[in-house]
């Protein structure tokens, strides 16, 4: 942030984002786009600006650890818990899922609109998580942060620089805009797409059991390993896969 005060913002380019032509300094504006008709009010007003796209996230207090190990009793309780179609989905989580689905219906048109308006860049908020898991500088920068549903396809590639910001950084910008305080930010986004297609691989393994009474039974366990630019290694489901293998 350059004005009204100088500050370092925690941001990172989203997958398949375009690059800026070196450092870009521009005025920051926010938009509220719920449907395609909302685009009309911004025509001719966004050129050369850095656009905040997305709601401000709440930063809840964190009063306990984000991770913990289940006790034997808790594991027994989970094993006996009746499984329902909505198991584990809280009303808050379902509301976020519904909002995300609605946003995805117009996301390609929004991306094309920003490109046509020649915006300098787009800043999106990192998605939040339960119990403050998306705060403290944590960035969720995977396919869910991408401005578009299929930007990995060449003709659908994002044509403007897009970054995802930590919710604290995004919230500061958002509140200043709401208070009608002019904000200027400098961004320098440098990205590179390594090829039109990267291969994925499947790994299949058989682990024989040791209980002769169960020798005719087969247990299938599956998982996926994704590497995303915001982290190192199998940041998506790596831990879950190891737990499944251990079990």
Task: For every predicted segment, state its role.
Residues 65-80, 124-166, 178, 196-198:
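Surface-exposed loop and adjacent secondary-structure segments within mature catalytic domains
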Residues 46-51, 117-121, 183, 215-219:
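Loop/turn elements at helix/coil->beta-strand transitions in domains of secreted/extracellular proteins
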Residues 1-15, 101, 111, 119-150, ...:
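Protein/peptide-recognition domains central to ubiquitin and immune signaling
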Residues 16-40, 147-233:
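Soluble metallo-hydrolase cores and metallopeptidase-like ectodomains found primarily
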Residues 234-247:
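Active-site alpha-helical elements of protease catalytic centers
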Residues 1-88, 148:
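Noncatalytic luminal/extracellular "stalk/propeptide" segments of secretory-pathway proteins
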Residues 15, 26-32, 41, 63-82, ...:
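Second-shell loop/turn segments in exported
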Residues 38-39, 59-64, 130-139, 229-231:
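Extracytoplasmic/secreted cell-surface and envelope-processing proteins
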